[in-house]
Amino acid sequence: MKEVVIYTDGACSKNPGPGGWCAILIYKGIKKVLKGFEENTTNNRMELKAIIEGLKALKEPCKVTVYTDSAYIVNAINQNWIGKWQKNNWKTSEKEEVKNIDLWQELLEFLKVHNVKFEKVKGHSTDTLNNMCDEIARSMIKEMR
């Protein structure tokens, strides 16, 4: 099984507002940059979108390590919030509807195909590739305005 690393980030100007996302895929030292923009979105949607688009770009099942600065996503996966949400018919422990259900469901489909591990990185820190993703995601907002 091919081993791929994906660095991701999402950004939003105002929340909600225009947003950008970036995913950097690395396989055998070769980097591929994916990026996108949405007119009216949220930061969390852009974080999810970056991961989904990164996984969507893989042409066969892979062993993937996703690096993200989103505690929201890392906790939802690694602490199995997402499993609890599904059991509770996509409701939080406070009985409120989970936000971004459409994207969580899409992500779950890719998690069935790929062996994915999520790692939290500190945002706006010394992680070069996370910082690059952040810059690209923010640049998408500026370019599209």
From Swiss-Prot:
Protein purpose: Endonuclease that specifically degrades the RNA of RNA-DNA hybrids.
HAMAP family: RNase_H (MF_00042)
MF-aspect GO terms: magnesium ion binding; nucleic acid binding; RNA-DNA hybrid ribonuclease activity
UniProt-annotated binding residues for Mg(2+) 1: 9, 47, 69
Species for this entry: Caldicellulosiruptor saccharolyticus (strain ATCC 43494 / DSM 8903 / Tp8T 6331)
CDD domains according to UniProt: RNase_HI_prokaryote_like
Domain of life where this protein originates: Bacteria
InterPro entries, A to Z: RNase_H (IPR050092), RNaseH-like_sf (IPR012337), RNaseH_domain (IPR002156), RNaseH_sf (IPR036397), RNaseHI (IPR022892)
Cofactors, names only: Mg(2+)
Binding residues for Mg(2+) 2: 9, 134
Broad EC category: hydrolase
Location in the cell: Cytoplasm
Record flagged with keyword Cytoplasm: yes
Identification of the protein by name: Ribonuclease H
The record's free-text note on cofactor binding: Binds 1 Mg(2+) ion per subunit. May bind a second metal ion at a regulatory site, or after substrate binding.
Domain RNase H type-1: 1-142
UniProt similarity note: Belongs to the RNase H family.
